């Protein structure tokens, strides 16, 4: 499986290679410019807008600029005029050496859309160098028997200029023995040969000298000179001869210094010193002399400087074998440099865009070029990025690539990407170059605020102070910057009757909720509303949450005594027969509390009594009963004060005062009589009062039944609009009783009244309350109405 994956990857790389080669062959049109070397920086080269047929403002709007593969900006583009100018002074000899023509390649990058234009700049040579002889003095040893027409090699002059500005001719100072003949070597260089015009005579002229002058073809021409000394030697009539007239050898460019490249060999038929051969490099350029060395005795050619295939691919060297008599032979050695994969690919970034918006696909992030100066497979390259990134590489002309987003990005998932661009050649071993870049993702408003809870429940005690902080809501936004800044607001309530604007307010910055006024549990137990969270993006996004506010009851209402009605001018009087048994029900104190829960749990106790121990009050229902048998010695009149107390904190209380009259029977009530009143008058008055009392009780019973029915119907019609309340759960103290119905002032209190006529004690019982909660004003009114039931004896019902 591993071999199969490797093979697949190799096939993909080969396909990408063919695509790149095809695109490079089908590149866009090339525009050529020409400029002479040594021109000052800022010199005009050409007008790009005119040549391309574009308007100058289009070059500016598309961000046109000049880029090059060698990372040196030798040209600059004036986007205001479209002129291409020199950024530096160009030296043709430094840039191209002996290569002619000297052409530099540039690209013009334009964006929106991305476009590459190929530019060739030809650097024209000027005659700024004079011919130079490496040796200012040459020594020639010529045998005297050299025939007329014999040719002798002279060292050639070096001129860094090319073309017509290179060395064109050689001359020598006038003499009668020699003239100059021009030759061209394999490197297309001209070199001089000295031709013998007149036989030499050692005895007549053992030595002669003349000036050798090299002239170039410039205008005006430049020249260089060297002194030639000719020493006439005696009879040496055999020249050295090489085994081969031409040698060819191939060596890798990474050969170590000092390694043996080739050994040349020559022989001379002469004997003695005339047969001794000396090997030298003839007409060698400076590069050859720096790179190679020949052993003068053995003919071994060794490497003295590193080779670089990318700089010079081959060398042609003339080896000269000279004997002691001055005769020589020559052979040509061609050294072919073999390329090795010693150069890693290079990446040149032309432009980069960061940050990029998160929701825009196919955005150009980077424009870059790649190259490998090796040759063959060593110079073929493939480019890749990790597959798990939402980016894609797209190739362009001349090894240019664009890095683009493959799909919309999500900043909330990944805020930045570290991208490694890997460029690998196909040499052995493979060399690669990695370029790391960080791309930041800018935020767009694509996330609405989110509340930490879908609903909030807040508890507020009633009677709170205005502007009280009752709670907070919180929302977060996954975006960043202003897109994540949240503003809070109150939304219009669904219930149009809810005065939300006067109840609560919200801090727009932090979501704190405040009660605007004091709340009353008895008026409003609970309410709910919705809050909104809106970010500051464009367009703004929002969300909402439900807030429920529950008002907690406080013990702010004292118990209210319903029965007996408290009227300072007409206190309640109860009749008790002296024959009553212990536990006889005298009356029942009925009270209510406007609060709820334990604040409405009431307990009763006898606070004061005329005769302690005679009467008792049941703590849980307020019933007043006799505690023992009555006797004739007990006083006829008794005043009882009953304390009604709730279970709040702190507790609130009320008192009920009632008068008890002990009588021998209901037919003979004991009442104080005027001293002159006759007995018959007492009987008549008692009968009248009993009739009035019976009528009052009957009317009160009938009125209670009607009131019960009316309250039932009213409660049923208002059940939907009345807010719910919480009722304390669990057991409560046995001495307490909740007489508040459902525990709220908005509920009605209902009492059923029953007078047991058949019992021995004729008890008057209140079984269940059935009257609405009475406010302060109503209390006085009810007291006035109930005062009509009193008679002259002080009885009331």
Swiss-Prot record:
Function: Potential calcium-dependent cell-adhesion protein. May be involved in the establishment and maintenance of specific neuronal connections in the brain.
Main location: membrane
Gene3D superfamilies: Cadherins
GO BP, one annotated term: cell adhesion
Cytoplasmic domain ranges by topology: 712-797
The gene coding this protein: PCDHB11
Alphabetical list of PROSITE patterns matching this protein: CADHERIN_1, CADHERIN_2
Name by which UniProt lists this protein: Protocadherin beta-11
Extent of the signal sequence: 1-26
Extracellular topology ranges: 27-690
Provenance organism: Pan troglodytes
Annotated S-S bridges: none
Keyword Transmembrane helix in record: yes
Membrane disposition: Single-pass type I membrane protein
Residues modified by glycosylation: 418, 436, 487, 567
Any GO molecular function: calcium ion binding
Record keywords: Calcium, Cell adhesion, Cell membrane, Glycoprotein, Membrane, Repeat, Signal, Transmembrane, Transmembrane helix
GO cellular component annotations of the record: plasma membrane
Cadherin domain segment(s): 35-133, 138-242, 247-347, 352-451, 456-561, 568-671
Spans traversing the lipid bilayer: 691-711
Cellular compartment(s): Cell membrane
